[in-house]
Amino acid sequence: MSAKSKGNPSSSCPAEGPPAASKTKVKEQIKIIVEDLELVLGDLKDVAKELKEVVDQIDTLTSDLQLEDEMTDSSKTDTLNSSSSGTTASSLEKIKVQANAPLIKPPAHPSAILTVLRKPNPPPPPPRLTPVKCEDPKRVVPTANPVKTNGTLLRNGGLPGGPNKIPNGDICCIPNSNLDKAPVQLLMHRPEKDRCPQAGPRERVRFNEKVQYHGYCPDCDTRYNIKNREVHLHSEPVHPPGKIPHQGPPLPPTPHLPPFPLENGGMGISHSNSFPPIRPATVPPPTAPKPQKTILRKSTTTTV
């Protein structure tokens, strides 16, 4: 029994110890929570003060701007219902008291703003039109340049009245086509009227003169080559003694004639061939001495 009695109090002591410690811990935790709540409440009070200050500032700003119109009953009820606190309602009432006189100016201001916005809008279109006008002269400038180049081409081609005939259009291919046609027509008319200008290209190319001359009139070459050779053969012994009194001016240039046919293979013959076809075209059966005299004189002019 004694053992049991001893065991009971020993068992009761540890049972009483833990609940006392737990109570003290709970009390400490409650105190901490209360302190935290007090801090939160203090923060909430500060926030409420700040909100009131913000509302007062909003009221002062709205009262200075005077943006409110006459409020109808429905608008009043809507604003009151929409307000979440009494501070908003009080602020609205304060604003209404300050703005007793109804203001119809706000609707006038937006109209003025619209007019101000409409005025700057029309000026931008003129600058849009001006660049288009600036582009037009740019297009005119390149059209003027090809005309100048065509003028130079016409000058090189030998057409004095060509640039005046060219239109001032934008198409540049038309004057080029006219240029291609004009020299061809001139070349076609020249051999029909006078074959003298053919000596120009022959002077530039001295080695292919026979080939070019055969292309123009192959029939005349066979006739006059033999006659010209005979003329030059006769002229060699005749000129040194000076037996020919009628041909005074051709005597000094005649010594230059023999080296040309010897070196280039018929330079003097080619020049003489270019000029004589004028007479055979008009008079097919000319006598031998007549073309010889003309050949000598014209050959001297070409060599000079």
Curated annotation (Swiss-Prot):
Region (Disordered): 1-27, 66-91, 114-160, 239-304
Biased composition (Polar residues): 1-13
Source taxon at top rank: Eukaryota
Annotated disulfide bonds: none
Entry coiled-coil feature ranges: 33-70
UniProt-listed Pfam families: DUF4589 (PF15252)
Presence of keyword Coiled coil: yes
Keywords in alphabetical order: Coiled coil
Keyword Coiled coil found: yes
UniProt biased composition (Low complexity): 77-91
InterPro entries, per database record: Largen/INSYN1 (IPR027997)
Function text: Regulator of cell size that promotes cell size increase independently of mTOR and Hippo signaling pathways. Acts by stimulating the translation of specific mRNAs, including those encoding proteins affecting mitochondrial functions. Increases mitochondrial mass and respiration.
Other facts: Was named 'Largen' because overexpression causes cells enlargement.
Protein name: Protein Largen
Record organism: Homo sapiens
